[in-house]
């Protein structure tokens, strides 16, 4: 023991400090303050004093011992039922002391000592609480102690054996470990009461379970009796029919055959049914296990009774028709869970419908609904908690007045017809020279202040690869200027631009460019456009034709006048003092500034700090730049701006909207990302399964893996689409990855892992990426013009094509004499009629102009000397490899197979 203070020792003994100081004083330990220290010697003196104060006379101890044996049923880890013998032993010790004559009354509280020893052969039953008797002693100054025994707490079970032993008890030495409080006694009594309640609940549940099992057995027996009666009636009927057949057979003199019974050779279905009855049900936990398939405890063989009736009792059930809510995409396992069936059942049904699926495959909504209806359930299209519904509620502010806005004009036409040059003259800036190859490869958006008002121009590419970009331009525009070269006429992209404008319902203004050239023919252009459905105003149509020259500036003012006249007719208006809405015209990834998107504001006012949601991307507008790169704070309707601060590069053509809540914008963006990923995965898996067998039949297709990186989203999209169109049945372009931004080290690692070639369009790789590519041997190609990229990829695909084999006849030989040599075989003496014959050439043996054999020459000689070739009008001797069937008059057609390179 360590030294403690008087107050700490009083807390340990659970008694007042004043009482402890009095006892210490009577024990000869001089302590007067609660903070005085007590050492081991002081504590020993106090203990000796207390022992002397209690005395040794007339102490008796009563010991009660009780035993009880019971049985419980439990299951082991294998589910087998076991009967376990449980023996409960309880022991109580009661101590009684005499009362002194002059001493005050002191109560010695003795708790009930419960010592339960449970002996179980294999399984440990429910835990039994052990209670150790610890008498509580309240010390008083007088040495005489009065002991009053506490009432004994009865056990929850009857006591079959009880022994009472009276003996002289040894002096009880009160120690700190033997002191117990009244709260502890109450807690133990409460615990004993709960144990009794738990035991009663378990016994009641056991009785109810046995009653249910007895009821099920009775119902099963009744069903078996009914089945036996039905079978007996059927058997009697069959016997009567058999006797009738036997009598007929006896008259005809035939042998009698026993009728086939269920379970015999002729009835396989009956045998399968009986086998199912023999196995029965597997016993589970909680059952008694009697008669189970693993109940053979003593190693004896146990014969199972086979019920020859109609089977065990089964409650009649009718098919459950469920309402299954199908989202846009759902996996096979989730669909099976919704219908409460196994996934293999769905796989079987879809195999019958002609689709091979796996348990984790994602199905689209239409396919899943067909499967659900095929299986007899009711399919409903699920109405998810779509955050996009918030955008529908986020309608235009009707109280904001509409104001006049500038027209958005898109310049469209064929490549090299002068679209950008026309805009340059209007903007008084030479932009075409900055484009690689002099062709526009991404959308340029500008707004121009003219004398008649402001006009916003969108310049679209004319190359065939940029179809999607032209479609986006027509979608975002109010008026289309169709530029047609007077010396070139209507070309394929001109027709496509007309179709885009008509599909968008946008008026056309035709600018006949390059009228200053000597070979210009504007009248031919008009006739060709009339054939395409574009009627000039002078012919009674609604499309004004303006002859212009982008080089000299002729007709530019008339063109702008026609554009503004069309805008006045359209009466273009938009809300200005409202949250902005617009269209993402172009997007790219800038190394220093991150995601940069060109946005055309269509209504409202876009300000710095607004929360913008564009498709699957959202973000706060950190900065806004105009088309000249100057920072601005706000942009109204029909103004194109570059915005910075989006979380990722948005897809070109996405609708952009300003929201007031960043949390809602993030929620909608994440929802769209998950939805897009699920739909894309479903399409990929469907395409894989549809093409799997076709690829197995056609053989392996050679693939050219590519990684495409471009400066802007539109150029990357156009390049991917154009390169994908180069694929055919033998070679295929596989786009491993396509993105905007510089070539990074992750792109090089991906190319090294997939064996791909990196194509950089208007971008370059940094120093680290170049070194990594050199170490890995990754090929990086840089292009500034889309023509060059397409031509080189086409050449690479042509090299991957297997060469074409062509057959060329080189000579004709006539057999004039045949010699038979024992070791060699048949030798033909021949005359070369035309051409030449070489050693090891391939020949065809012709007899009466019918091919008899096709093979190779074995040897070629002239005057007993081996020669390499023999030309026309010369004689030679030859033998055929593996063929001796030659005759005089046969002809040999000599030919060779040449491989010719193919091209796309």
Swiss-Prot record:
G5: region residues: 549-551
Key words of the record: Cytoplasm, GTP-binding, Initiation factor, Nucleotide-binding, Protein biosynthesis
Location of the region described as G4 in the Swiss-Prot/TrEMBL record: 513-516
Region (Disordered): 239-316
Alphabetical list of InterPro entries matching this protein: DNA-bd_dom_put_sf, EF-G-like_DII, EFTu-like_2, IF2_assoc_dom_bac, IF2_II, IF2_N, P-loop_NTPase, Small_GTP-bd
Main location: cytoplasm
Residues binding GTP: 413-420, 459-463, 513-516
Domain named tr-type G: residues: 404-571
Places the protein is found: Cytoplasm
Coiled coil: none
Basic and acidic residues composition-biased segments: 248-278
GO cellular component, one term: cytosol
Keyword match Cytoplasm: yes
Entries under NCBIfam families matching the protein: IF-2, small_GTP
Function: One of the essential components for the initiation of protein synthesis. Protects formylmethionyl-tRNA from spontaneous hydrolysis and promotes its binding to the 30S ribosomal subunits. Also involved in the hydrolysis of GTP during the formation of the 70S ribosomal complex.
Family membership noted in the UniProt record: Belongs to the TRAFAC class translation factor GTPase superfamily. Classic translation factor GTPase family. IF-2 subfamily.
Name of the protein in its database record: Translation initiation factor IF-2
Organism annotation: Dechloromonas aromatica (strain RCB)
């Amino acid at each position: 023991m360590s030294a403690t203070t008087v107050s700490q020792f009083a807390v340990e003994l659970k008694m007042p400090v004043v009482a402890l100081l009095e006892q210490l004083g009577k024990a000869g330990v001089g302590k007067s303050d609660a903070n005085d220290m007590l050492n081991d010697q002081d504590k020993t003196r106090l203990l000796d004093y207390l022992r002397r104060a209690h005395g040794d006379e007339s102490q008796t101890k009563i010991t009660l011992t009780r035993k009880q044996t019971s049985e419980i049923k439990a299951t082991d880890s294998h589910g087998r039922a076991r009967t376990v013998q449980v023996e409960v032993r309880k022991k109580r010790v009661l101590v009684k002391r005499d009362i002194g004559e002059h001493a005050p009354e002191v109560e010695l509280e003795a708790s009930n000592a419960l010592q339960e020893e449970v002996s179980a052969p294999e399984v440990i039953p429910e835990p039994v609480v052990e209670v150790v008797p610890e008498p509580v002693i309240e010390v008083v100054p007088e040495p005489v102690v009065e002991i009053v025994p506490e009432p004994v707490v009865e056990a929850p079970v009857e006591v079959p054996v009880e022994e009472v032993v009276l003996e002289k008890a040894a002096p009880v030495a009160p120690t700190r470990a033997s002191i117990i409080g009244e709260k502890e006694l109450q807690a133990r009594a409460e615990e004993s009461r709960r144990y009794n309640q738990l035991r009663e609940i378990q016994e009641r549940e056991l009785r109810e379970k046995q009653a249910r099992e007895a009821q099920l057995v009775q119902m099963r027996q009744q069903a078996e009796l009914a089945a036996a009666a039905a079978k007996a009636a059927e058997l009697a009927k069959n016997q009567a029919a058999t006797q009738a057949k036997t009598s007929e057979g006896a008259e005809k003199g035939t042998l009698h055959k026993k009728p086939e019974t269920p379970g015999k050779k002729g009835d396989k279905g009956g045998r399968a049914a009986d086998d199912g009855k023999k196995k029965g049900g597997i016993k589970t936990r909680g059952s008694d296990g009697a008669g189970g398939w693993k109940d053979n405890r003593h190693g004896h063989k146990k014969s199972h009774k086979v019920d020859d009736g109609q089977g065990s009792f089964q409650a009649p059930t009718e098919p459950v028709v469920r309402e299954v809510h199908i989202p846009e995409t759902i996996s096979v396992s989730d669909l099976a869970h919704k219908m409460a069936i196994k996934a293999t059942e769905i796989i079987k049904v879809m195999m019958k419908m002609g689709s091979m699926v796996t348990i984790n495959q994602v199905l689209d909504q239409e396919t899943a609904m067909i499967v659900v209806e095929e299986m007899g359930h009711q399919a409903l299209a699920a109405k998810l908690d779509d955050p996009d519904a918030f955008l529908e509620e986020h309608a235009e502010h009707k109280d904001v007045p509409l104001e006049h806005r500038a027209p958005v004009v898109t310049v469209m036409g064929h490549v090299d017809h002068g679209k950008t040059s026309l805009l340059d003259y209007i903007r008084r800036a030479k932009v075409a020279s900055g484009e690689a190859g002099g062709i526009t490869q991404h959308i340029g958006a500008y707004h121009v202040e003219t004398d008649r008002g402001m006009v916003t121009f969108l310049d679209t590419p004319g190359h065939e690869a940029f179809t999607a970009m032209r479609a986006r331009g027509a979608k975002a525009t109010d008026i289309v200027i169709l530029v047609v070269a007077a010396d070139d006429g209507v070309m394929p992209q001109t027709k496509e631009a007309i179709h885009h404008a008509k599909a968008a319902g946008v008026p056309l203004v035709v600018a006949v460019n390059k009228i200053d050239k000597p070979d210009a023919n504007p009248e031919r252009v008009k006739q060709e456009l009339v054939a395409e459905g574009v009627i000039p105003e002078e012919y009674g149509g609604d499309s004004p034709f303006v002859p212009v020259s982008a080089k000299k500036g002729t007709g530019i003012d008339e063109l702008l006048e026609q554009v503004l006249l069309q805008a006045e007719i359209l009466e273009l208006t938009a809300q200005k003092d409202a949250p902005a809405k617009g269209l993402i015209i172009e997007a790219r990834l800038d190394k220093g500034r991150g995601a940069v998107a060109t946005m055309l504001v269509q209504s409202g006012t876009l300000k710095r700090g607004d929360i913008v949601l564009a498709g699957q991307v959202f973000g706060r507008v950190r900065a806004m730049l105009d088309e000249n790169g100057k920072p601005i704070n706000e942009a109204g309707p029909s103004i194109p701006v570059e915005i910075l601060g989006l979380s990722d590069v948005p897809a070109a053509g996405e609708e952009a909207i300003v929201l007031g809540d960043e949390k809602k914008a993030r929620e909608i963006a994440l929802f769209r990302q998950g939805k897009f990923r699920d739909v894309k995965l479903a399409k990929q898996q469907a395409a894989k399964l549809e093409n799997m067998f076709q690829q197995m039949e056609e053989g392996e297709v050679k693939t050219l893996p590519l990684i495409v990186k471009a400066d802007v989203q539109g150029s990357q999209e156009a390049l991917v689409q154009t390169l994908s169109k180069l694929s055919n049945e033998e070679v295929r372009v596989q786009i491993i990855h396509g993105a905007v931004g510089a070539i990074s080290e992750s792109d090089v690692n991906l190319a090294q892992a997939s064996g791909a070639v990196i194509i950089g369009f208007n971008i370059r790789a940094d120093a680290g990426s170049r070194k990594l590519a050199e170490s890995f041997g990754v090929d990086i190609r840089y292009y500034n013009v889309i023509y060059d990229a397409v031509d080189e990829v086409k050449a690479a695909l042509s090299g991957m094509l297997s060469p074409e084999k062509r057959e060329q006849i080189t000579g004709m030989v006539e057999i004039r004499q045949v010699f038979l040599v024992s070791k060699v075989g048949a030798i033909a003496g021949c005359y070369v009629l035309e051409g030449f014959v070489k050693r090891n050439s391939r020949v065809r043996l012709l007899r009466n102009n019918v091919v008899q054999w096709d093979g190779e020459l074995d040897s070629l000689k002239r005057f007993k000397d081996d020669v390499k070739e023999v030309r026309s009008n010369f004689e030679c001797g030859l033998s055929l490899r593996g063929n001796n069937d030659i005759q005089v008059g046969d002809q040999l057609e000599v030919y060779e197979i040449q491989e010719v390179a193919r091209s796309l």
